[in-house]
Amino acid sequence: MGEDRLVEIPRSDWEEWRDLYKRDWPRHEIAFNLVQNYINWSKHDRKIKDLVLYSLNGSWRENGTFVIIDRIDLYMHTLDESLDTLRRALELVDWDYYYVAVMCEHEALLFDTFKKLNVRVGIGRANTVYFLPKEEALKFNVTVPAGLRLGSLEPGHAKIITDLWPHRERGSEFSIERLVRWNPSMGLFDEQGNLLGWCLLTQPGVMGSLGVIEQRKGYGKLVVMAFAKKLAEMGRNLYASILVENEPSKALFGGLGFKPIKDVNWIRNRERKFVEWSVEPYLAALGIS
C-alpha cells in the first residue's frame, strides 16, 4: 500500500461525485449542496483562487470522503462509517495555516488529529443545525408592510453586512460579497432603498449571516420567511446553523417550524507560521489569548 496523499477531484467528475450523496436522502443533503455550490461557482470562475477539493488517494468513489479548503473555510464529509479515510485525509492537511472547520460533525476526530499533530485549537463554537422541509416553507404567507420591499442583495451591500456581522474577520467582506454575487440572497429595503435586513445562502446551502439594522421590528422573521419560501420554490430544503447560546435565533427559527436535527461545531485552529489569514486578531477581539 502506497503512502497516503490528498488528490484533487477533477472538475469533470464533480457531478458524479455530488450524486454519491443522494443516498439516504436527505441525510447527506448538506454535502450534496456543498458540491453543487462549487459546480455552480465554477460557471462563474473556472479557477477560483484559494479553492481545492480533495479526496484521499483519489478514492472518493469508494467512500465519498472529501476535504474542501476554500480560503480559510474547511469542509469535510465521508460516507465511510469507520471514519478511517477522513482521519487519514485530515492528517495530511497543512495545519500550519489557519482554517475554520465549518459545521464540523466530527469534532472528536478533528481534536484527535490536532492532538496527534500538535495543532493548537483557537476556538470552537457549538451550533445546532435546524431543518425545515421545503413543503412547509412553501406554505409561508409572506406579507410585506407598506413602505418596505423584499429583493435580492447587491454587491455593494457586502460592506454593510460585514460591518455589522459579529463574526467578521480579515477577508470577511470578500467572502460575503462572493455569496451575494453568486448565490441566492434576500434583503429587506425601505422606500429609499436602504437595507434593513438580510440573509445569505452559504456554500453548504445553509441560511446564514441573518442580520437587521434595527431590532424588535419583525424584520428578521420577515426576511427568514421570504428567503425560506424563495429557496423552497427553487426546490431546496431549508437549513440553518445556530449558535447554541443564541436564544433569539433559536426562538425565531423554531417558531417558524424549523426543528433541531444535529449538533455541529465551528472549530478554528491556531496557525503555526506567519500567514495572510490569522486567527489571532479574531481571538483578541473576543478577549482570548
Residue ranges and their predicted role:
Residues 198, 221, 261-266:
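Residue-level detector of high-confidence beta-strand sites
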Residues 52-56, 185-190, 241:
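Cytosolic beta-strand hydrophobic patch enriched in CBS
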Residues 169-214:
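A conserved beta-strand-loop-helix scaffold within acyl/acetyltransferase catalytic domains
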Residues 36-146, 152, 265-269:
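Acyl-donor-binding surface of acyltransferase catalytic domains
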Residues 81-89, 216-231, 250-251, 255:
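Conserved acetyl-CoA-binding loop-helix of GNAT-fold acetyltransferases
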Residues 101-109, 230, 240-254, 259, ...:
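Conserved beta-strand-loop-alpha-helix junction that forms the acyl-donor binding cleft
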Residues 61-62, 194-197, 248:
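Glycine-rich acetyl-CoA-binding "A-motif" of GNAT/NAT acetyltransferases
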Residues 1-31, 135-171, 279-282, 286-289:
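Short amphipathic alpha-helix that is part of the acyltransferase structural core
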